[in-house]
Amino acid sequence: MEKMSHDPIAADIGTQVSDNALHGVTAGSTALTSVTGLVPAGADEVSAQAATAFTSEGIQLLASNASAQDQLHRAGEAVQDVARTYSQIDDGAAGVFA
């Protein structure tokens, strides 16, 4: 039978994934200002339509990015929870043998 174990570094990896996701959300929020603040290149109708299309597409991509960052954050928290559970069980089992 194979021994089950985990590497305690998993909690650190989960924390890093969660932190990276939070940085991604911050970057998306910063980009929102640039995406929504685009001024048409000229006074013509084509420039106005291009600016509107750019803004619309940018907002959709940033919403998708925010959703992805949320999922990454949840995944990082799940890894942290698993590592915490393993540590608690290992500590409890070690107490039985001590």
Swiss-Prot record:
User: Which Gene Ontology CC terms are recorded?
Assistant: cell surface; extracellular region
Instruction: Locate the transmembrane regions by residue number.
Output: none
Give one Pfam family, short name only: PE
Q: What gene name is given for the protein in this entry?
A: PE35
Q: What is this protein called?
A: PE family immunomodulator PE35
The source's domain of life comes to Bacteria
Q: What protein family is recorded?
A: Belongs to the mycobacterial PE family.
* Localization (cell): Secreted; Cell surface
| Domain PE: from-to ranges | 1-90
Q: How does it assemble?
A: Interacts with PPE68. PE35/PPE68 complex interacts with human TLR2.
Key words, A-Z: Secreted, Virulence
Q: What does this protein do?
A: Plays a major role in RD1-associated pathogenesis, and may contribute to the establishment and maintenance of M.tuberculosis infection. Together with PPE68, stimulates the secretion of IL-10 and MCP-1 from human macrophages, via the interaction with human Toll-like receptor 2 (TLR2).
Organism lineage reads as: Bacteria, Bacillati, Actinomycetota, Actinomycetes, Mycobacteriales
